[in-house]
Structures are given as C-alpha cells and as structure tokens.
Amino acid sequence: MNDYNSHILQWKKTIMTITTLSRQNIQALTPYQSARKLGGNGTIWLNANEYPTSPEFQLSGKDLNRYPEPQPQRVVQAYANYAGVSTENVLVTRGGDEGIELIIHTFCEPKQDAILFCPPTYGMYAVSAETAGVLSKTVPLTDDFQLNLPEIKNHLNDVKVVFVCSPNNPTGNLLKQSDILDLLQITAGKAIVVVDEAYIEFCPEASVINLLKNYPHLAIIRTLSKAFALAGLRCGFVLANPELIDILSKVIAPYPIPVPSADLAEQALRPSNIATVQALTQELLSNRQWLAKALLVLHQVEKVYESEANYLLIKCQNGQAVFKALWEQGIILRDQNKTLHLQNCIRITVGTRNECEKVVEAIKEVK
C-alpha cells in the first residue's frame, strides 16, 4: 500500500472514530429539516412562516467590547409591558426553540422521563427531546385537530413536559381554551404544560396568558420571529411563574442574547413599533383571506383549512405534483405529505399580495 492510500485509510478510520464517539441517540437522530436546510433555488420563499418584508432598525453599535447582560433588562421590561405580565414572569431566549430545549433539559431526566406532544405539530419538540436523550410520547390530535384529552390522560406516566401549539403549526387552527384548561388540571403536580404561542400575534385574543396566575406549571413560548418580522434576530421568550423562570435561569447560557440582538429587540418592542406591527398584521390577515378564497376555486385544491396564523394548510388532489411544479418555478412551499394525517397537504406561508397571486396562478397551471 502506497503512502497516499495509507493516508486515506487512516483518514477514513479517523472519521469513523469521531462518529462512533458521539452519543448513540445522536448517531440515530434525524435532524429537524428547517426551511433553509431543505434548500431550493427559490425566488419566492413561502415555506418558513417568515414575515414577507423586513423592518428597518439602526444598531446603536455601543458596548460591543463587553459581554451582554445575563438577561437584557430593557428587553425584559419591554416584553413584560407588551404581554401584560411582571418582569419576574419573563425569560429572554435565543428564539422560541431555545425555550423548548431549556424546559426539556431542566425538567426531564435522560432515559427516564418523557415529553408528550400531539401530532401533527411543530417538529422541534421531538428533535429537542431526542438530542437530550429524553423519551417522546405522542397522542395524535383528533380529526378536527383538537386535543384528545382522554388519551393524553392515559399516557401521562413518566411524562414531565406536555407540549401543545396554538395556533398549531402546521394546521393553523386554535386549540380550544377549555381543553387547555382541562389539560392543566389533569397535569397539576405531575408535569409542565408548555403552550407554544409563536403565532399568537395573529389572534391575540386567544392567548392563555391569563391562566399564568392560577397555574404554576404553565409555561408559554413566544417569539419575535413571526409577526414582528425578526426571524433573523433569534429572540424569543418563556413566560411563566417566577419559580419556573428561576429554575430555567439556572440552565440557560450565561450570555444568551447578543448585544445587537437585544438592541434591536428593545426597539421592536417600543409602543410605536408595536402599533406598526399590529397594522401590518391586519394587512397580512387580509392577504390570508384573499389567498384562501382564491385557492378554494382551483381544481387541484380539495380543501383549505381554517387558519388563525400567517399560513394556510391546503389539501391537494396531488400534493407532490403541486409542490414539485412550484418548486421548479422558484416558489418554495412546505411539503406536509409525510406528516401524520396530512397526505397530499402543503403549508403555504402568507406572503405579499403579489406573492400570493403568483402562487395561485402557478397552482392553477398544475394538471
């Protein structure tokens, strides 16, 4: 064997050793397929539930030589004011996803405890549990995408955290508040209930934030990624009672929010910008209504599901054909065909009116 082949063999052995050194559950892990990771040569991106246009803020550019605060106090205060809670109820995180991970790491013993979630729903609950070595239990939503409370009650053994999403991603519907209340009652003293409200700005009256004062095991996930149009900022929040926030604070990284992110988040939460966000949200909801009506008359579209978020779930005669045809035209949607109970379904982020019109015209041409 010459030196070159010997070097290649040794290199391959090194790679194999690095892989086998990783935890077994990580070796077997199928990572979350984010919209950007799925790629595509898109010109119209409607697959990540992002806001279609970017806000304009100016960085202050100061104190970049210093580590940030453990919790950016101006952001904490501003979000507490916005959400109508005390600063003691707020923890700022790197996006809503970090809040999900923190809660799992804080409350679940690896290989012993489990989380429970209700598919079809957001995929990061399962991925975050798997990376932490925590078991997952699933209780599918009912045919109308509501909680199956009797089955949840039957599967609570060893469950430390229950995740629900309202409005639910990818279906877009709200969970019944009465069901969330029942869930809180059957889990009291047993598990943390996490209500993911990433899309709540599109239906603020449906928030369960009023339940915080009576349920110490309730945690709410929020984000600036959706209605605030700051997905690139990576800024989210956990809202909960002070005892729960204090426990999470033990686990969170010492400097989680970079100074520039905190700067922009504080600007985004000023009353003047909140008013702008609310006005733009109404414009987007108008686009959603237009898109839903336009899709309903297309021969390829069998159903447009009711949505309270910034996206629509549609069922097609041939979802794969529709998805592929639009992909090839640079219109990138989110294929849901492999998701539980969502065969031939596609999720479409509501974009600008021009983008919505192009989606409708493109689907109209699919045979």
Swiss-Prot record:
PANTHER family from the UniProt entry: HISTIDINOL-PHOSPHATE AMINOTRANSFERASE, HISTIDINOL-PHOSPHATE AMINOTRANSFERASE-RELATED
SUPFAM superfamilies for the chain: PLP-dependent transferases
Superkingdom of this protein's organism: Bacteria
Subunit: Homodimer.
Protein's recorded name: Histidinol-phosphate aminotransferase 1
Pathways per UniProt: Amino-acid biosynthesis; L-histidine biosynthesis; L-histidine from 5-phospho-alpha-D-ribose 1-diphosphate: step 7/9
Family according to the record: Belongs to the class-II pyridoxal-phosphate-dependent aminotransferase family. Histidinol-phosphate aminotransferase subfamily.
GO biological process: L-histidine biosynthetic process
Source species: Haemophilus influenzae (strain ATCC 51907 / DSM 11121 / KW20 / Rd)
EC number: 2.6.1.9
Modification N6-(pyridoxal phosphate)lysine, positions: 226
Obligatory cofactor(s): pyridoxal 5'-phosphate
Amino-acid biosynthesis keyword on record: yes
Gene: hisC1
Top EC class of this enzyme: transferase
Alphabetized Pfam families for the sequence: Aminotran_1_2 (PF00155)
UniProt GO molecular function: histidinol-phosphate transaminase activity; pyridoxal phosphate binding
Substrates-to-products reaction catalysed: L-histidinol phosphate + 2-oxoglutarate = 3-(imidazol-4-yl)-2-oxopropyl phosphate + L-glutamate
